[in-house]
């Protein structure tokens, strides 16, 4: 049998990144945390943590973290069921961790799960990352589910297709006016690749590859070099486009919601970039996580393209 206190210490060290922070979170001494980790590693006969300035889990440590989180959620479900039949008007609230890309979070994920969270008194802890990288948080045990482009289910997980987010290349009208000047070179739909490559792109962060996909898919440009602004916030990203700072990729869902904001013009409106999304989650889901998965399914079905 695994020792519950040792597992709790392991999870705290991984989540907080250091032994000292874990000790503070658990209200025990640093020596006690160290002893529990050493005892657990000795009992299992392998290293569970990679020591360093930022402590991280080994693959075995990641597996144990997933186990700890699943047990914690199942225990919380049990306690919630017991409290619901008692006179306690304010039962303890559970917390679920998920990883979601910023566009999905703003456009359909949060509106789709808000009602569930309120009905079942659930808390949500969201890790925001690019859709091509959110699965890393699930793999590490940090979250119970993620919105991802990874179609292949990871070990111990299920991958469910959600639908497609369709992105358009857009820019401010003033910037498009500048592009109307005659320009030689490779053109698609009247738009010059030379103009695009000579104009800054507005990009969410360094993991964002949508602009590269647009250039490769519609202009045949692989690994193109062009100036870039990095604006890692959805509202500020759109504001940068409105101000004419450059061109960028925005999903149809967010474009449709821009009724009271300055107009953005679609560049090659009939040539989108489609991003297929999946919901990857634990195969063994506690009840609270099952409810979240159902809400995610329903929200995606209502908002995403079902191609």
Task: Label each PLM-derived region with a short phrase.
Residues 43-44, 64-89, 296:
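Alpha-helical linker/hinge and terminal dimerization helices associated
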Residues 16, 25, 41-47, 119:
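Residue cluster at the C-terminal edge of the helix-turn-helix DNA-binding motif
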Residues 11-29:
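Short helix-boundary/capping micro-motifs
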Residues 41-59:
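A short LG(V/I)-centered, amphipathic sequence patch enriched
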Residues 29, 36, 112:
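Residues within the DNA-recognition helix of helix-turn-helix
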Residues 265-307:
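A late-sequence structural motif
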Residues 91-155:
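Central regulatory/effector-binding core of bacterial HTH transcription factors
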Residues 159-245, 257-272, 302-307:
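C-terminal regulatory
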């Amino acid at each position: 049998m695994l020792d519950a206190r040792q597992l709790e210490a392991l999870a705290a060290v991984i989540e907080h990144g250091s032994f000292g922070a874990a000790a503070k979170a658990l209200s025990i001494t640093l020596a006690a945390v160290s002893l529990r980790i050493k005892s657990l590693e000795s009992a299992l006969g392998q290293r569970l943590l990679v020591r360093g300035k930022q402590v991280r889990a080994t693959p075995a440590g990641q597996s144990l973290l997933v186990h700890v989180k699943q047990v914690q959620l199942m225990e919380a479900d049990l306690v919630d069921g017991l409290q619901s039949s008692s006179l306690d008007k304010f039962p303890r609230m559970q917390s679920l961790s998920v990883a979601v890309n910023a566009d999905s979070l703003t456009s359909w994920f949060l509106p789709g799960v808000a009602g569930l969270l309120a009905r079942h008194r659930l808390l949500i802890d969201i890790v925001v990352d690019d859709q091509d990288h959110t699965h890393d948080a699930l793999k590490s045990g940090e979250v119970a589910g993620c919105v991802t482009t990874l179609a292949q289910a990871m070990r111990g997980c299920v991958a469910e297709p959600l639908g497609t987010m369709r992105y358009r290349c857009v820019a401010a009208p003033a910037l498009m006016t500048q592009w109307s000047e005659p320009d030689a070179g490779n053109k698609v739909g009247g738009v010059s690749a030379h103009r695009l490559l000579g104009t800054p792109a507005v990009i969410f962060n360094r993991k964002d590859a949508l602009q590269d996909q647009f250039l490769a898919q519609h202009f045949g440009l692989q690994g193109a070099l062009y100036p870039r602004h990095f604006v890692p916030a959805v509202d500020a990203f759109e504001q940068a486009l409105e101000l004419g700072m450059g061109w960028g990729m925005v999903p149809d869902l967010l474009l449709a919601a821009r009724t009271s904001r300055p107009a953005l013009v679609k560049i090659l409106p009939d040539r989108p970039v489609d991003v297929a999304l999946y919901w990857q989650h634990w195969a063994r889901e506690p009840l609270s996580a099952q409810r979240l998965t159902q809400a995610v399914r329903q929200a995606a079905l209502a908002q995403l393209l079902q191609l």
